[in-house]
UniProtKB/Swiss-Prot annotation:
At the equatorial segment of the sperm head. Homohexamer. Catalyzes the reversible conversion of alpha-D-glucosamine 6-phosphate (GlcN-6P) into beta-D-fructose 6-phosphate (Fru-6P) and ammonium ion, a regulatory reaction step in de novo uridine diphosphate-N-acetyl-alpha-D-glucosamine (UDP-GlcNAc) biosynthesis via hexosamine pathway. Deamination is coupled to aldo-keto isomerization mediating the metabolic flux from UDP-GlcNAc toward Fru-6P. At high ammonium level can drive amination and isomerization of Fru-6P toward hexosamines and UDP-GlcNAc synthesis. Its main location: cytoplasm. Pathway: Nucleotide-sugar biosynthesis; UDP-N-acetyl-alpha-D-glucosamine biosynthesis; alpha-D-glucosamine 6-phosphate from D-fructose 6-phosphate: step 1/1. The active site is at D72, D141, H143, E148. The modification Phosphothreonine is found at T161. Its EC number is 3.5.99.6. GO terms for molecular function: glucosamine-6-phosphate deaminase activity; identical protein binding; isomerase activity. This is Glucosamine-6-phosphate deaminase 1.
């Protein structure tokens, strides 16, 4: 397990974006080899998405051969509704990059058979060869996607009734009117995320410090679903200083001492422009015995 600690939200977002960029480029995706990602919504990943858009616009990164699977979606909210996660992803990320619409997968909260939709989502992930990198965020109570406290740590994609705390927290997105807030959602399970070959969890802000403490310093507990990733062979937690306020001083000191090593994951920072130049130069080399 890696814990990456940066001073500010912007730095944590940039580190995460650099890591994603390097993972995609080093994977060397193509028509017969897609890089498959799991993606979150919410305010935490916005800075990371903005950096990834910047890399694409600068010609350093392409999403042409990337497939994405989103974590969750509200039940009963039209996909064109401004607060649907479909709208969130297209407005904040997908429409700004070169990803093909057919390669983006978001659960349909208006499907006639919701459980069948969840089962089909799991099958699409399997058909894509599994998820290479699942990026996630958490809530202050440590929930991942809509896997709230008490969720099974081996759960799969399913229909979930939302806790009142979640409904109250989400009311700010619906003019403060509880009657407008969806009470159910479709969500990937903790087990679905655990199946990914690598997991990266973004945690920023003092309001999530206790959840990070539970994830790093205490044991695995279904009341804090983020703690499950202690048992994943490749987990990267990326956080800012504010999120570490509940950690022991020696814990913070230990992981900060590893930053020289961990920064080698993003430095050098690769670019598809460099790869294209290398290919061009290789093609121009004269034949020799």
């Amino acid at each position: 397990m890696k814990l990456i600690i940066l001073e500010h939200y912007s730095q944590a977002s940039e580190w995460a974006a650099k890591y994603i960029r390097n993972r995609i480029i080093q994977f060397n995706p193509g028509p017969d080899k897609y890089f498959t990602m799991g993606l979150p919504t919410g305010s935490t990943p916005l800075g990371c998405y903005q950096k990834l858009i910047e890399y694409y616009k600068n010609g350093d990164l392409s999403f042409k051969y990337v497939k994405t699977f989103n974590m969750d979606e509200y039940v009963g909210l039209p996909r064109e509704h401004p607060e649907s996660y479909h709208s969130f992803m297209w407005n904040n990320f997908f429409k700004h990059i070169d990803i093909h619409p057919e390669n983006t997968h978001i659960l349909d909260g208006n499907a006639a058979d919701l459980q069948a939709e969840c089962d089909a989502f799991e099958e699409k992930i399997r058909a894509a060869g599994g998820i290479e990198l699942f990026v996630g965020g958490i809530g202050p109570d440590g929930h991942v996607a809509f896997n709230e406290p008490g969720s099974s740590l081996v759960s799969r994609t399913r229909v979930k009734t939302l806790a009142m705390d979640t409904i109250l927290a989400n009311a700010r997105f619906f003019d403060g009117d509880l009657a407008k807030v969806p009470t159910m959602a479709l969500t990937v399970g903790v087990g679905t995320v655990m199946d990914a070959r690598e997991v990266m969890i973004l945690i920023t802000g003092a309001h999530k410090a206790f959840a990070l403490y539970k994830a790093i310093e205490e044991g695995v507990n279904h009341m804090w679903t983020v703690s499950a990733f202690q048992q994943h062979p490749r987990t990267v937690f990326v956080c800012d200083e504010d999120a570490t306020l509940e950690l022991k001083v020696k814990t913070v000191k230990y992981f900060k001492g590893l930053m020289l090593v961990h920064n080698k994951l993003v430095d050098p920072l690769y670019s598809i422009k460099e790869k294209e130049i290398q290919k061009s130069q290789a093609a121009k080399k004269p034949y020799s015995d």
